[in-house]
Amino acid sequence: MARMVFCEYLKKEAEGLDFQLYPGELGKRIFNSISKQAWAEWIKKQTMLVNEKKLNMMNPEHRQLLEAEMVNFLFEGKDVHIDGYVPVQTNTKA
């Protein structure tokens, strides 16, 4: 049976992560209150950030920036802003 958590990002019960993916206290918080679906959405945003801002994970400042963006996205409801990126519009004509 899947481990269920109340996901702070989705604001509902959802399948939790299988194991802690991030170190430290923040990692524990993510493991206990972020779902697999929310984590997958973050990974997409993280990839965009790393690529568009040319972040180097060997640089401590870049890692701090990425961690701050992750907290904002997962826990504070702030979307990731990437200069020049326009989300694909879905046509919802009925």
From Swiss-Prot:
InterPro entries: Fe_traffick_prot_YggX (IPR007457), Fe_traffick_prot_YggX_sf (IPR036766). Keywords: Iron. One of its GO terms (cellular component) is cytosol. It comes from the Bacteria. The keyword Cell division does not apply. Belongs to the Fe(2+)-trafficking protein family. NCBIfam families: PRK05408.1. This is Probable Fe(2+)-trafficking protein. It comes from Haemophilus ducreyi (strain 35000HP / ATCC 700724).
